[in-house]
């Protein structure tokens, strides 16, 4: 096994798989606004090739950044010179990637049913799409697969529809993996899909949800980016579209929505991880959802699932003005977080995007809320930075289990509070 792993790593190196040997993830603690601004100066130095996992927002909020090996000494010297404290969260990113790849290689057997599918490992795009087909074949009266569009690179964008019948019923939308490197979200989405088929008719609360509403689940919301994380660059976040006049690829699909687009909280630089794109809905992955939601016209809850930081967020992100339904959203978020914590003790914070983390313009749930979808939420799943986007596969099922309890709380509330 060890020889095979070494051989596979060598082959990937030859084929252009990006290497992260010696890269470190630093947690920076800015004591005041002046130090936050100094960290932002670092962010603007493109030659350092820094990858901010948690942005420099305001004092008191941790800033996590992946630093390439050639830039480590410069970054640490800069921070120390300005009296900015930091700690090393991940000593060598590549070591964690090697562990992740070895774990995946050990569980590559092709599943013949969704019962034998391994929910405790990470899967490729093809494997997830095969899982979707298996689920539809096993539960044709409950599950169907619809294609809402094609990606920039021509891949189909699939959504699972769970329904007990009827036309244009009120519906709940859940998406995972809009940021491609957040692998625990796509893995959780797969688990949710199976959970829906298992719990319908068994769990009275969930059965009541599906008896009254359809559920749409988009497990891989950014297929091009997700495929790229498996084949080339595990740390890829954005779409894979091309921007005229720039060699940099991709747009942040969570800054591309028509809600506060172009305001502070997104970047106009195509090389930035938070590049918003040239205009709202420029990304077909975003436009496909916009068109679907608009044409459906009866979506009552919209939940977009990210990682990491252990947060449950509601609008707004682009403005500090409270959402008209803030009191209800805040109380519902509190109830959902309480349910989540009850299973494994995982602590979540909750609140509006702008008050809880930072200003973010052009975000998914700000747009859905502007379309009249009252129950618009974003999750940030495990963890709080110890492993970040490289969450061990052993945490997939516990993460999905606890998140399901929060989702069920939101779905149950949505059914019981029609509008």
Swiss-Prot record:
EC number(s) on record? 3.4.17.1
Q: Which InterPro entries match?
A: CPA_M14_CPD (IPR034248), M14A-like_propep (IPR036990), M14A_act_pep (IPR003146), Peptidase_M14 (IPR000834)
Q: Does the keyword Repressor apply?
A: no
Q: Name one GO molecular function term.
A: exopeptidase activity
Active-site residues are: 380 (proton donor/acceptor)
**Gene3D superfamilies named in the record:** Metallocarboxypeptidase-like, Zn peptidases
Q: SUPFAM superfamilies given for it?
A: Protease propeptides/inhibitors (SSF54897), Zn-dependent exopeptidases (SSF53187)
Q: Which cysteines are joined by disulfide bonds?
A: 248-271
Q: Which transformation does this protein catalyse, written as a reaction? A: Release of a C-terminal amino acid, but little or no action with -Asp, -Glu, -Arg, -Lys or -Pro; leukotriene C4 + H2O = leukotriene F4 + glycine
Q: Where is the Peptidase M14 domain?
A: 121-414
Cofactor annotation remark? Binds 1 zinc ion per subunit.
CC per GO annotation: extracellular space
Could you say which residues bind substrate here?
179-182, 237, 254-255, 307-308, 358
Q: Which cofactor does it need?
A: Zn(2+)
Record Pfam families = Peptidase_M14 (PF00246), Propep_M14 (PF02244)
Cleaved signal peptide residues: 1-16
Q: According to the lineage, what is the superkingdom? A: Eukaryota
Keywords attached to this Swiss-Prot or TrEMBL record, sorted alphabetically, are: Carboxypeptidase, Disulfide bond, Hydrolase, Metal-binding, Metalloprotease, Protease, Secreted, Signal, Zinc, Zymogen
Q: What does this protein do?
A: Carboxypeptidase that catalyzes the release of a C-terminal amino acid, but has little or no action with -Asp, -Glu, -Arg, -Lys or -Pro. Catalyzes the conversion of leukotriene C4 to leukotriene F4 via the hydrolysis of an amide bond.
Q: How does it assemble?
A: Monomer. May form a complex with proelastase 2.
In the record, the note on similarity to other proteins reads: Belongs to the peptidase M14 family.
Q: What is this protein called?
A: Carboxypeptidase A1
Gene name, per UniProt, is Cpa1
